[in-house]
Amino acid sequence: MRLLMITIILAPPMAGLILGHAKPQTQATQSGEAKRFLGTWRLVSIVSNSQMSPVFGPNPVGMIYYDGTGHMAVQIMPDGSRPKFAGSAPTPEEAKLALTGYIAYFGTFTVDEKARTVTHHREGSLTPGMIGIDLVRRYEFDPSDRLILTPVEAPAGHLTWERLL
């Protein structure tokens, strides 16, 4: 009897997955400027108030990905000069230091060509308080096809990304 109840409860959702009737992923309309975002980008620099950002050091590293289904992910961290853990597991202080300045989140994105902004709709983040909070960035593509993102709330700073793929 218990097996029959489990089968009745699970059968409809599983059938949808097996037969391809499950809810499709959100498809973004990628036209015009939005298509220029698609691909893999490497962080070139972070400038804050016309100076290199001290939080990330002189040579921060990072990647950002935009795909044709409207999904994106980003990771940014300080340069490689951070100390390694003394043991196999970090001490509380080592763990805190490892997370300092590390940014990682994923979600979907939308492009507003008229406003020349891209919005990252965060669905997951290393920083729990940032989940569900949108990030709006003004964008421009320079003549060498680098992507420059400027936070709307801090227009004196910007991130420059170089296309890899």
What are these regions (language model features)?
Residues T7:
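Active-site bordering "gate/hinge" segments
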Residues L10-A11, G16-L165:
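Lipid interaction determinants
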Residues M1-L4:
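Positively charged n-region of N-terminal signal peptides that target proteins for export
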